[in-house]
Amino acid sequence: MERVQRVLEYNKMKQQLLEHVASSLGRQKVNELVPSTSLEEVRHLQDETAEAANVLRLKGHVPLGGISDVRPHIKRAAIGGVLSATELIEIASTLYGGKRVKQFIETIIEDGHIEVPILAGHVEQIEPLSPIEKAIKQCIDDNGYVLDSASTSLRTVRHQIRSYESGIKSKLDQLTRSSNTRKMLSDAIVTIRSDRYVLPVKQEYRGTFGGIVHDQSSSGATLFIEPAAIVTLNNQLTEAKAKEKREIERILRELSAKVAEESEQLLLNVDKLAQLDFICAKAYYAKAVKAVKPTLNDRGYLDLRQARHPLLPPDKVVPSDMAIGDQVRSLVITGPNTGGKTVTLKTIGLLTLMAQSGLFVPAAEETELAVFEHIFADIGDEQSIEQSLSTFSSHMKNIVSILNEMNENSLILFDELGAGTDPTEGAALAISILDHVYKRGALAVATTHYSELKGYAYNREGALNASVEFDVETLRPTYRLLVGVPGRSNAFAISRRLGLDERIIDQAKLQIDSDASQVEKMIASLEDSQKSAQSEWSRAEAVRREAEALKRDLEKRMASFEEMKEAALQKAEQKAEKVVAAAQENAELIISELRDLQKQGVAVKEHQLIEARKQLEEAAPKLVSKKRKQVKKQAEKAKRLPEPGDEVKVLSFNQKGTVVKKIGDNEYQVQLGIMKMAVPIDDIQLLEQERRQPEKAITTIRGNDAHVKAELDLRGERYEDAMRRVEKYIDDALLAGYHQVSIIHGKGTGALRKGVKQFVANHPRVKSARDGGMNEGGLGNTVIELK
């Protein structure tokens, strides 16, 4: 299988697949990918790809950022090792990524728009382990710095360090400002040697200056001396830093122990994330190459529809249609060299390998492929499709091996069968080999330019001819496969087109016997008939597509009409509601005035006031009642009840609010401004909006908001790791309330800068991005404005 993968360029296809993984976890899975020979397993692999493809169609992406292969860290912690701060934050980031993708899939399951049982099975085994994530993030920031808040002792000792450093700098500043001292210094700066603060003193003042010499310049003209006035403070600072180091080690040891306690579940989480990354990569790749899920069988039947080779440029590849299997067990593709026969052969083989690997195939719907136990290919000398053919002996050695290993559940691909030797003998061998393969029950597709094999399919049961179309006018192959029609050499037509004397061509025709001439004429007639039938089919297909387009357009117009009708009714009702409200306001004013008159002794009967109010109040509830019926109808159509966080409209108040919680079978608590009130379900209208993510999805990182910096330094990072950090950093910056942040990537080769620009350009929460100004780092810094 390894040899046929190389011949059919399976590994090149895997390189394309690698472009769609989100992490090194998915990359490892792709590198391990091999075709399966079990129909049941292949169907499962195809089903998981289909689930991920449906998720992409519904949501557009799967959030897999921030995850990385932390298995070595986990295993080291499990045997008692102490992890570094960077390793621990990578574990926390992977936990966060796992929690996010778990919530993402669970939300899809709750919505019920699509079924994802395989993906659900994977995320079900992922445990968020929030206590570990929270513990790490409370102690370490995203840059791997252990925070002061990690412990009381660390906060205290760092306060001491800052105090000592401040005292040292103050004394050194006094010395550098002193006119007596300044003349002794090579430069009025403070520097550090051997973790001690020192001043650069000229060699000639060594005895005068006093203090401890820690270093000297390469020329010897400058000595780096620790002044006697700060020796004690420097000693205290050194001791404090040693305490800080011990405390950090203690914190890292405790966090590593927490990781060790959950090492088994952590490893399972990572394995499931690797599987999810791989499955989603297959779906992303299918979308990129416009691939479909094939129907599968185990009876050796292939039905390729508009099949395309995935390694060829989409604008140049010509789709092919062909069916082989069941009654037809051998397909012989004839025609001249450079006609595209080898491309067709490789397309059949590679698409079969892709399907057996659980990948969708670049073809049209209803494509069907078989799952074979063995796939063999004798194609050239294992060269790319542009290279020349191998020798006869090389071909024959490979063919002998194939014939010895094949069985009835095998697919065999022969390129230029019988080539490289005497044409008569080569053709005879080719016919005999094809007969042998047919008797063994295997499926064979062979290409040849020998005219002797053109009649093979007409004389053999279970065999079919095919050819690759050649345009005599342009002298170029069209690469279109014509099934049922053997290929022609077109030698006379091509020679005439190139200007060969007609007398020479006529003389050459006399050298061909009448039977051969009749065969060529028959082939030409078949080819013309095939083209005519194909043309008619294309016209019929165009009419069908036009009819479907008209049907879709009509449905769209009907839907638009219904929306316009509904909008007009709603507008009329709103207008009526305003009229009633205005009338009610005026009536209330009149009733108030009547009461004033009543108090003044004017005869106004109370029952008249009550009746007037009653008539006014009866008008508005009718509108509200009608509105409630509409809302109920819309709710039934939407098939979704309000949920906490949903924005709604309370009809009786005509006010927008937010659902807090459900407090009864048909009653919800709604936040209206500063008020919370109970509202019945038929008084609530769900507003059109993107559904909010539950608050619990972000609460675990609140403790880290205070430590998010206004800039992210990516210098020295690998591209893949850098992109994960950018995605995570933008999420944290938004949660921390930043409106503008900077991402430092350096100038270097420009790869990081380009990657950052491409990422933020597609981020929904990024308003704009620009290069830093002269005082902002220039092209080495990208300044991002957040929405």
From Swiss-Prot:
Keyword Transferase belongs to the record: no
Molecular function in Gene Ontology: ATP binding; ATP hydrolysis activity; ATP-dependent DNA damage sensor activity; endonuclease activity; mismatched DNA binding; ribosomal large subunit binding; rRNA binding
Disulphides: none
Keyword vocabulary terms for this entry: ATP-binding, DNA-binding, Endonuclease, Hydrolase, Nuclease, Nucleotide-binding, RNA-binding, rRNA-binding
Class of enzymatic activity (EC top level): hydrolase
Binding site for ATP: G335, P336, N337, T338, G339, G340, K341, T342
Entry's EC annotation: 3.1.-.-, 3.6.4.-
Gene3D superfamilies: 1.10.1420.10, 3.30.1370.110, P-loop containing nucleotide triphosphate hydrolases (3.40.50.300)
GO biological process, one term: rescue of stalled ribosome
Signal sequence residues: none
UniProt KW Ion transport keyword: no
Domain Smr intervals: 712-787
Stored InterPro entries: DNA_mismatch_repair_MutS_C, DNA_mismatch_repair_MutS_core, DNA_mismatch_repair_MutS_sf, MSSS, MutS, MutS2, P-loop_NTPase, Smr_dom
Family to which the UniProt record says this protein belongs: Belongs to the DNA mismatch repair MutS family. MutS2 subfamily.
Quaternary structure note: Homodimer. Binds to stalled ribosomes, contacting rRNA.
HAMAP family, sorted: MutS2
NCBIfam families: mutS2
Function: Endonuclease that is involved in the suppression of homologous recombination and thus may have a key role in the control of bacterial genetic diversity.
Name of the protein in its database record: Endonuclease MutS2
Organism encoding this protein: Shouchella clausii (strain KSM-K16) (Alkalihalobacillus clausii)
